[in-house]
């Protein structure tokens, strides 16, 4: 049976993820919530640009219609 997208995201709960937005912005943080519209809640969120942290946000909500991709992040790997 094929994996469903929300199942993959559900397994990433309470883990670090990289969220790539349509306009090229990237955020990294711990995924603490999501819904069927892919609205994403990150804790310890950081904006990443050229592989470097440019701003720290703490807890943020990212609107789902801006999300291009969500990827698990291995600790220590960028």
From Swiss-Prot:
One of its GO terms (molecular function) is RNA binding. GO terms for cellular component: ribonucleoprotein complex; Sm-like protein family complex. Residues 4-76 form the Sm domain. Gene3D superfamilies: 2.30.30.100. GO terms for biological process: mRNA splicing, via spliceosome. It holds the Pfam family LSM. Coiled coil: none annotated. Keywords: Ribonucleoprotein. Belongs to the snRNP Sm proteins family. This is Putative snRNP Sm-like protein.
């Amino acid at each position: 049976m094929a994996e469903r997208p929300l199942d993959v995201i559900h397994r990433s709960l309470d883990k670090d993820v990289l969220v790539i937005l349509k306009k090229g912005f990237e955020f990294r943080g711990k995924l603490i919530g999501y819904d069927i519209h892919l609205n994403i809640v990150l804790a310890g969120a950081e904006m990443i640009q050229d592989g470097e942290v440019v701003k720290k946000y703490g807890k943020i909500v990212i609107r789902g219609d801006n999300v291009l991709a969500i990827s698990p992040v291995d600790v220590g790997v960028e």
